[in-house]
Amino acid sequence: MDAVIYAGSHRRGGNSDRAAELLAEGVRSAGGQADILFIRDYEIRHCKACGFCDTATDCQGQKRCALGQKDQAWELFEPLFTARAVFFTSPIYFYHLPSMFKTWVDRSQFLWTARRTNEPWTDLPERTAHTVLVAGRPRGEKLFEGARTSLKYFAANFNLKLAEPLVFRGVDTPGDLDAHADFTTRITVLGRQAWSEVAQR
């Protein structure tokens, strides 16, 4: 897979969905292929903190999680092991990621524990993950900090280093993003530049 873009909004057709489309346009304009995965379209159960992943040292991949074969969380995780470029887009809900997105992030706990037994994916080459965050609030000193911190350590599960996020304030109702030509241009440029850098390696 060339590039995978995860869109984390619960709302279909909102601004972070639009950001995902713009990133894809940027990647394609640079000669890459991009797939957008909408997290809301997948069934993801909550981590139960059952401890199964701590003791199931003879299991790998999705079998390391007690819920791994009962929902679609692993289906979303898989591209993160192979994609050459990774992007996340998300709105901000109460200074953090939306609940469905955060539920998926929480389900990656088994990957942290799997590192202790050196599953094959742990030696993946380091890659970069890029993020676009949009918030309805026009102000807030730490408006993006919760989402950024969670994504930083989530990405590390897959040997992905989170680049400085592209963030936008005062983007709330559908169409707000497109109302700012400079915003849409910056997102498209991010997609194009990110893929161009990957393609040169």
Language-model region placement:
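N-terminal beta1-alpha1-beta2 submodule of the flavodoxin-like/Rossmannoid cofactor-binding fold
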Residues: 1-90, 95-113, 173-201
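Residue-level signal for alpha-helical context at structural boundaries
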Residues: 21, 34, 41, 119-123, ...
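Intrinsic disorder/low-structure terminal segments
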Residues: 80, 86-87, 153, 157, ...
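Beta-strand-loop-alpha "switch" segments that mediate conformational coupling across diverse proteins
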Residues: 163-170
